[in-house]
Amino acid sequence: MSQEISARLLPQKPSKWAKILLNRKVPIFLFFLLELAFLVFSYISLQEHFPSIILWEHLLSVFTFLYLLNRSMDSRSKLSWLIIIALFPIFGTALLYFSLADFGVRRLKKRLVEATQQTSDYLATEPEVEDYLPHSDRQLQRLAYFLEHSPAHFPIYRDTKVTYFQLGDDMLPALLEDLKKAERYIFMEYFIIDEGIMWGEILAILEEKAKAGLDVRVMFDGMNEMTTLSYDYIERLHKVGIKAQTFSPIKPVLSTYYNYRDHRKITVIDGQVAYTGGVNIADEYVNKRERFGHWKDTALRLDGSAVQTLKALFLTMWTVTGIEDKRDMEHYLQEKPQQRKSQGFVLPYGNSPSTYHKVAENVYLHLLNTSTNYVYIMTPYLILDDELVRAMTFAARRGVDVRIIMPGIPDKQYAFDIATTYFKALLDAGVRIFRYTPGFVHAKVYVSDSQQAVVGTINTDYRSLYQNFEDGVYLYKNLEVLKIEEDFEKTQALSEEVTLESLSKMPMAHRLGGYLFSLIGPLM
């Protein structure tokens, strides 16, 4: 059944040449190329007809350098921009101001602010939790205060049952079972959806539920139309009764809009159960297809009060992307999930480029700065700003056991090469780094002191921390924290430790490539 639906939603396979000509990437790439060629041609023409432009070019570079040096910005980002402007004064300066102006996303940010204000009315810490917090640990109070006073008002919950999945393989059967039990609605928001076994099984259930009259909604990032799905996939889903939207579809126009991607992975079922974590909807995430060896990923299942926040995050993006009015959001947010008795606290949150609060990074910094015994990290990428470098090295130097597990088989070699440029400073400070020998680590996990942990979609890199829409779940004194710690130790046992000696034996091409790419790493 699932394979039939999956095949039916795929377009008929064209010939090799038709595939090239009909591929949406081709016209978009050509338009981008033409726009770039026009800019280069205009610049060369100006130089030929107006020799004095070179003087103005130097003056512009000096002015921009001074502007950057006095601007509030991460020093590594500043360095990247300074290098680009030094090499390409006119183009680099134009690109800088074009990026800072953010013309392409002003409307998006305005709609985000409006939608976030609507959801915040339905997100509040429950009275019994508020009464308890003053008597709880100081570090929990501080983080809860920060997140509740962020623009989106993320509250802390107690009555939520949490299940941690060590692999996407373990998560999928539970997800399918919960989808089958849905009675009113299913909301799904994913960075990647790819045709295959996993999506076929999910899609079979979604179509069945849509036919039964449930409100079934699917939203995916616009990059899918360039990589995994056909450009008319939305219409194909509509035909089987599923409401669908694309976030930020790619069009042949230069815009900063494309820089912001929806990297979230959220499923909400009847407002009672929710899933999130690193697992996208594609076969490699559940090891049904091998791409980079064994795929190590993690996920959480929430059942109870905390689902309200993930539901609000989905409805915010759905409203921003589509044309739904305020009543649609109110209809679903007015109802609250049933409480489930559980030990500890659960605090889901979102990260958005529309706010300067750096929610995701500050949560990671909180774990690093408040830890007393250990901080264990699993991440596919490691492109750090100064704050994270300082926090990791300082934690290690004050005696905290800081360990990081990264892929043994990276999916992007350049990204791993950039990560290695941080290794020496981290190793010198006492941080231990491991590579997952069986394959690729896609998990985004921080766990500390057997008390607190974060599982979500947020990589430890610039794109996740500054540019993408992300989500995470902070756990405090929840029983699943111990399972996360145990999972890390099992994963470490399968990993090879990186040492200064092994680092020095890296191929020169990768070492050089890492340093070159790291110069523009914050902009990638």
What are these regions (language model features)?
Residues 1-362, 366, 370, 410, ...:
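N-terminal localization/anchoring segments of enzymes in phospholipid and broader phosphate metabolism
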Residues 191, 381, 415:
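Glycine- and other small-residue-rich loops at beta-strand/loop junctions that grip anionic moieties
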Residues 371, 381-403, 407, 412:
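Helical hairpin unit composed of two closely spaced alpha helices linked by a short loop
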Residues 378-379, 406, 436, 455-456:
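Thr-Gly-centered strand-to-loop micro-motif
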Residues 390, 416-420:
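Short glycine/threonine-rich loop-to-helix capping motif typified by GTGT followed
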Residues 432:
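Surface segments flanking catalytic/ligand-binding clefts of nucleic-acid enzymes
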Residues 444:
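Catalytic-core elements of nucleic-acid end-processing and repair enzymes
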